[in-house]
Curated annotation (Swiss-Prot):
Record Gene3D superfamilies: Hypothetical protein TT1679 (3.40.50.10360)
Annotated organism of origin: Streptococcus suis (strain 05ZYH33)
Domain of life: Bacteria
Protein name: UPF0340 protein SSU05_0314
Family recorded in the similarity comment: Belongs to the UPF0340 family.
The organism's taxonomic lineage, starting at the top: Bacteria, Bacillati, Bacillota, Bacilli, Lactobacillales
Stored SUPFAM superfamilies: TTHA0583/YokD-like
């Protein structure tokens, strides 16, 4: 698969997820990425730095224009810690942890985030408003409740299965309560 094709597919999926999730400036978008799955391998076994770089660089270009922060999830060897900009970690009072990702501990996406972000750091936990999962990496633990599945028109980037999540405010109060309309549930 050509890197150009991966870039185009990534761009299409991320733009759709942003549109459907109604993410706003200052909010957080999580990326879970298995470059191994993108190139047709098994998660964690065939990592590709080139794929990680093209995916992360493409997403950062889109998010930076909108003022949305990117958080890049690492693999289970790093307890699914995330690379974020130091500015975000300070702003949200996130605990910074001391680890540098490698190709097989953190993965290609995290290495790319360290290359392309201005001042990257690792944090252990985050609560993001939306995200995309390329290769079934399980990003749900980092998405705010209540999570709403999003189905992008492309179901794969390369050979990796793609899913996405947005979030909405919890509905409380039961049958007597009235609720405001929100963008995510309009189509429901």
């Amino acid at each position: 698969m050509l890197l150009r094709e991966i870039k185009d597919q990534t761009k299409q999926v991320v733009q759709e997820v942003l549109e459907l999730s109604d993410l706003q400036k200052g909010q957080i978008f999580v990326l879970g990425l298995s470059s191994s799955e993108v190139i047709g391998g098994h998660i964690g076994k065939n990592s590709s730095l080139e794929v990680g770089e093209v995916v992360v660089e493409t997403i950062l270009e889109i998010l930076d224009q909108k003022g949305i922060y990117l958080a890049v999830q690492g693999c289970e060897h790093l307890n699914r810690a995330l690379v974020v900009e130091r500015e975000l970690a300070i702003q949200k009072d996130l605990e910074i942890v001391n680890v540098l990702p490698t190709l097989h501990a953190g993965g290609s996406g995290q290495l790319a985030a360290f290359k392309y972000m201005k001042d990257p750091v690792e944090v252990e936990f985050i609560t993001a408003q939306a995200g995309v999962d390329i290769g079934d990496t399980a990003i749900g633990m980092h998405i705010k409740h209540v999570q709403v599945p999003i189905r992008p028109s492309l179901r794969e980037i390369g050979q990796a299965h793609v899913t996405a999540l947005a979030s909405r405010p919890k509905l409380i109060g039961g049958v007597r309560a009235a609720y405001q309309e929100d963008e995510i549930r309009k189509g429901s």
